[in-house]
Every structure is written in C-alpha cells, then in structure tokens.
Amino acid sequence: MKIPNIEHAVFIEAPIEKVWQTLTTSEGWNSWFTDGTEIDLKEGGYIKLRWKNFGIGHYTTEDGGTILKVIPNIKFIFQWSPASSPTTVAFNLEQLGSGTKVLLTETGYPESEKDLQVCIGCAVGWGEALTLLKFFLEHGITYGKVPEK
C-alpha cells in the first residue's frame, strides 16, 4: 500500500514576513491555532506543538520534533511523529503581489493501515489549519474555545 503525500496550498492576503512570523514562532502559532507551542527556530532546533481543549472534541495533545530547514521567509521544514515513525512537514512561502502563497507538504508516512488513517486525519487537519491561518491573518478571526456541555 502506497500512502500519498499530503499537499495543501492557500493564498493569504498578508505580507510574507507576517506569514513567516506566524508559522515560525511560539507566539505566532499560539495566536491562531495552538496553546503552549514552543519553537527553537534553528536547524537542529525543536518544535513542540500543543493543543489544549481544542475544537468541538476538546482535544488535548502535543507532538513535535526536530527542525530540519530554516530559510527566512521562504522555507520551514520540521519532523514530527503523528504516525508510527516521523514524517516531514514543509511550509514553502512565495510572495504573490501583496500576499503570500503557502504550500504545505507532509511526507514519509509508513505503509500500514493504521498510518493511512493517521495520514487521512492529518490531511484534514492541515487543510483546516491553513484555512484558520488565512482567516486569522486576513481578518483577525480565531477558532476560539468551544463551550463544554
């Protein structure tokens, strides 16, 4: 079974520097998507993404790994471990007019039924994440906390 790569792209009407800062700093991630994320932004540094009581399911989880590549305002690549072995997530940025194209790819899923299910979940999650990033940077809208029953 060959598990496909995840690939999403979005255009965000925001300067590339602002998109970069939002994707490569703890403050950036925590302002729109996570709660308690930590980033040591350098090649060989680390990223630890944390969600607390997130979304309609009130999920609390974390994942992270090693930062592989940092080219300011162009490329941010890290490994994390949502599957049975690490996968590689790459954000590639490109200036388009007054906005920014963001291309996200995730590669390296092991070939198993369990990892296929994880890949499907991450594909949906990354699509949601880029939509939330766009809404935040263009309109200041965040998902917010969902009340408990």
Give residue spans per PLM region.
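Hydrophobic pocket/interface hotspot
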Residues: 19-20, 29, 47-49, 67, ...
